[in-house]
Amino acid sequence: MRVEPITDEQAAAIAEWRYEFPYEWYDTSADPRRVELFANPARRTHLRAVVDDGDELVGFFNFVPEGHEVRLGLGMRPDLTGRGLAQPFIAAGLDYARREWRPRTFRLWVARWNERALRAYRRAGFHEVGRSEESRFVEMERSA
C-alpha cells in the first residue's frame, strides 16, 4: 500500500462510502465537518489517499502535524474492513507521516464502542492515554 495526494475523484468516492451498522457513524454524510473536508479542496491540505498495488483506493489519512506530534484521522473503504488489512494500512500511513514530518508521537481518537478499531490500533502499537469528557472517545498515542 502507498500513500499519495488525494484526487478530486478519490475524495468524491470517499464521501459516498456507507458503513454497515454500527459503523454508519463513520459515514462522511454523518458529520458536516467531514462533508466539508472531502468536498472542499482547500481543506484537504493534509488529506491523503491510500491505494493498493493495483492503484485501487483502500482508504484515507488526514494528517494534522502539530509540533513534534502528528494527529491522525483515517478510514478504510467499507468493503475492506474486517479483512485483515488494518496493519499494513496503518503502517503505510505512519511511514508516510514519519517521512513527511519526522514526529516524535502519533495521536488519534477512536469511538469507545469501536472494539475492532481499538484492537487494530493496539496491535499497531498505540495505547490509551485518555478519554473525552463524555467518555465517548478514547485518546490513543504511540511513539513514532
Question: What is each model feature region?
Answer:
Residues 1-2:
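Extreme N-terminal starter segment of soluble prokaryotic enzymes
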Residues 80, 84-93:
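Conserved acetyl-CoA pyrophosphate-binding loop and the N-cap/start of the following alpha-helix
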Residues 5-73, 77-81, 96-101, 131-132:
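Acetyl-CoA-dependent GNAT
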Residues 107-118, 134-137:
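Conserved beta-strand-loop-alpha-helix junction that forms the acyl-donor binding cleft
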Residues 121, 126:
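Conserved active-site tyrosine of GNAT-family acetyltransferases
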Residues 71, 75, 107-109, 139:
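Conserved beta-strand segments that form the floor/walls of ligand-binding pockets within enzyme
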